[in-house]
């Protein structure tokens, strides 16, 4: 699992965490690394307009690799 290059939208994080039944991030907290690595914010995009909908239907846990890579916003 790679380090996110941007901060996730608060709504997406809440949906993912609630689906997983926890309050902790999906992986260990790399918040400082994320901020240090986010120089332009250009990488913080969803590659599909359905990302938020997918998160609300459980795709964060069903397909975490795709969601982390393609649904970053």
Swiss-Prot record:
Pfam families with a match to the protein in the record: ShK
Domain remarks: The cysteine framework is XIV (C-C-C-C).
Protein known as: Conotoxin Im14.3
Taxonomic classification: Eukaryota, Metazoa, Spiralia, Lophotrochozoa, Mollusca
Record keyword Disulfide bond present: yes
Chain ranges of the ShKT domain: 44-73
Signal peptide limits: 1-17
Purpose of the protein: Probable neurotoxin.
């Amino acid at each position: 699992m790679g380090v996110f290059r941007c901060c996730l939208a608060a709504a997406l994080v809440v949906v993912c965490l609630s689906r997983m039944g926890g309050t902790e991030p999906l992986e260990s907290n790399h918040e400082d690394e994320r901020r240090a690595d986010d120089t332009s914010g250009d990488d913080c995009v969803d590659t599909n307009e359905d990302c938020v909908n997918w998160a609300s239907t459980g795709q964060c846990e069903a397909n975490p690799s795709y969601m982390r890579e393609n649904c970053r916003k």
